[in-house]
């Protein structure tokens, strides 16, 4: 609808002033009383035309008022307010009914090669609620991009290198050694010291240790006596799942073996959790592969050649402060190991070399301070500034019976994403995670998510779809036939009531909503729109009989609710939420 008004305005500019202006706005006014859409175009022409905006707005309004698309075009304080005519709205609604979701599609992306990287949780523990929220934000954006013809790649970056993976191995070994009847106390003391300072304390670590014990018995209680090769072969032979890391990487010691084994089990669980949410990835990219292929080393050498790397205190530093970071950053420690930042730059450079024209990272809000150094490194590599976009996702607080559930990852006391999915279901999790801007904290009320009432937003929206499906089922039972869209469009002109015109408008504006949501990267606005539409529908349904009315009224109302049903279905589908036929 906005594009249509823009086209009409551009045509008027050509006819009246033989000029064009591209960057004017056509937006929904804050108050309905000001019309369906409003434009600021007159203000942008004032200098060129040497006229006050008020005069230009009036001339344009007078010209555009003759167009039958509009019921009225008014100039108000230099702005132009547009109201669509009912005849135009009804004709558009017919087009929509015949086209279905194709009516809302547009070649917005023009095949632009976009990479969306999201979740990318450390594979050292189960997914928590914050990861789940990031997953839903990323996946919904990916669905919207696909809908608007972007060439989308959904990618998960596996942080399978570095200290956190070593600490997973330490934590598993500590829990394993704890239960050894006879063990090497010196080893246990060393492992315990590291564990108590930095280890992972969740119950899942104990479960992995027990699973390991069932496979290898007590053979790792005394590491100096353990035959690492035999133990590894036993794990590979006895374990019921495919073990990628355990199989691919020859372990240096027991901790290394258990790190790989732990990685395999955690990645399996992460994939399963995401699958339960109907989230899949095109690429699972391993951080370790950047070291295996020599990409990290080559990248640091490239930055050296460009003069951005220097040595200090035995370490290699990157001059990120030259490009907006608050200080320079270490890329290689004095012990010869690379920092996470080094592999991260290599990963982004890898994305660039793969030909992505736009890269969007969905990160946890705790990464906020990390953004300037990444942007600085990309500037050094002469990658355009707008190539990388970073969306931040804030944490989720869980509430039960009005009280916050206290969680601590450090202490290993947290509700996992899997536990929440088991309790309230995928649809409630996905929908509620999108009910607020991603960069603001979200409160998740477990009781409300399970309610079958208007207080539960996902139920409220899904019920609109199910209710309309029920109307058509009842029609078939009563009249012993189905009704086609081709039949229904003949009755659209009989929709006369203010509430009906309002609903038609709401449906037709869905495309503008989707375009805005996609371009602004604000998928939460999809839930706002659907809750609003469902509310208008439920109100209409409660005050208007549909079946059993005289022919023109019944079929026109069936046409109206058919259109609403299609929009609710599409909106839910773009969020990965089901649209049930019955509830």
From Swiss-Prot:
The gene is argS. Belongs to the class-I aminoacyl-tRNA synthetase family. Its EC number is 6.1.1.19. It comes from the Bacteria. The lineage of its organism: Bacteria, Pseudomonadati, Aquificota, Aquificia, Aquificales. One of its GO terms (molecular function) is arginine-tRNA ligase activity. It catalyses: tRNA(Arg) + L-arginine + ATP = L-arginyl-tRNA(Arg) + AMP + diphosphate. This is Arginine--tRNA ligase. The keyword Nucleotide-binding applies. It comes from Aquifex aeolicus (strain VF5).
């Amino acid at each position: 609808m906005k594009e249509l008004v823009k086209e009409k305005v551009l045509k008027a500019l050509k006819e009246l002033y033989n000029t064009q202006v591209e960057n004017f706005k056509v937006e929904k006014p804050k108050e309905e009383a000001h019309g369906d859409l409003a434009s600021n175009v007159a203000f942008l022409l004032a200098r060129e035309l040497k006229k006050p905006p008020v005069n230009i707005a009036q001339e344009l309004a007078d010209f555009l008022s003759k167009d039958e698309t509009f019921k009225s075009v008014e100039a108000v304080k230099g702005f132009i307010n547009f109201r669509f005519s009912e005849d135009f709205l009804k004709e558009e609604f017919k087009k929509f009914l015949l086209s279905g979701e194709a009516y809302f599609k547009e070649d917005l992306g023009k095949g632009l090669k976009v990479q969306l990287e999201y979740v990318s949780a450390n594979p050292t523990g189960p997914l928590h609620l914050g990861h789940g929220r990031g997953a839903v934000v990323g996946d919904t954006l990916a669905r919207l991009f696909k809908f608007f013809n972007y060439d989308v790649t959904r990618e998960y970056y596996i942080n399978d290198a570095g200290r956190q993976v070593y600490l997973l191995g330490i934590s598993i070994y500590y829990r394993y050694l704890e239960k050894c009847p006879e063990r090497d106390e010196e080893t246990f003391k060393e492992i315990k010291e590291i564990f108590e300072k930095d280890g992972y304390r969740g119950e899942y670590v104990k479960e992995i240790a027990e699973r390991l014990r069932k496979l290898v018995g007590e053979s790792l209680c005394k590491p100096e006596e353990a035959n690492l090769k035999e133990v590894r072969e036993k794990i590979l032979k006895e374990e019921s799942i495919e073990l990628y890391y355990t199989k691919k990487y020859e372990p240096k010691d027991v901790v290394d073996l258990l790190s790989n084994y732990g990685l395999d089990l955690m990645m399996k669980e992460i994939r399963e959790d995401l699958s339960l949410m109907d989230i899949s990835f095109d690429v699972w990219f391993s951080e370790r592969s950047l070291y295996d292929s020599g990409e990290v080393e080559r990248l640091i050498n490239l930055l050296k050649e460009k003069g951005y790397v220097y040595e200090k205190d035995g370490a290699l530093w990157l001059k990120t402060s030259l490009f907006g970071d608050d200080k320079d950053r270490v890329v290689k420690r004095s012990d010869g190991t690379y920092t996470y930042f080094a592999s991260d730059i290599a990963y982004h450079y890898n994305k660039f070399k793969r030909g992505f024209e736009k890269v969007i990272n969905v990160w946890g809000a705790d990464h906020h301070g990390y953004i300037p150094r990444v942007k600085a490194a990309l500037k050094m590599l002469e990658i355009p500034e707008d190539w990388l976009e970073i969306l931040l996702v804030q944490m989720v607080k869980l509430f039960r019976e009005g009280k916050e559930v206290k969680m601590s990852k450090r202490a290993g006391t947290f509700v996992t994403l899997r536990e929440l999915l088991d309790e309230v279901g995928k649809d409630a999790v996905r929908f509620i995670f999108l009910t607020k801007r991603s960069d603001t904290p979200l409160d998740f009320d477990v009781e409300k998510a399970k309610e079958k009432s208007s207080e539960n937003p996902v139920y409220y929206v899904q019920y609109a779809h199910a209710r309309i499906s029920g109307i058509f089922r009842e029609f078939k039972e009563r009249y012993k036939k189905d009704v086609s869209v081709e039949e229904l469009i003949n009755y659209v002109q009989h929709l006369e009531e203010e509430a009906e015109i309002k609903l038609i408008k709401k449906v037709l504006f869905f495309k503008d909503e989707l375009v805005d949501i996609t371009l602004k990267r604000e998928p939460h606005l999809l839930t706002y729109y659907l809750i609003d539409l469902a509310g208008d529908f439920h109100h209409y349904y409660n005050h208007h009989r549909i079946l059993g009315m005289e022919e023109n009224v019944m079929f026109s109302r069936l046409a109206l609710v058919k259109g609403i049903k299609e929009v609710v279905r599409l909106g839910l589908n773009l969020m990965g939420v089901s649209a049930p036929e019955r509830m």
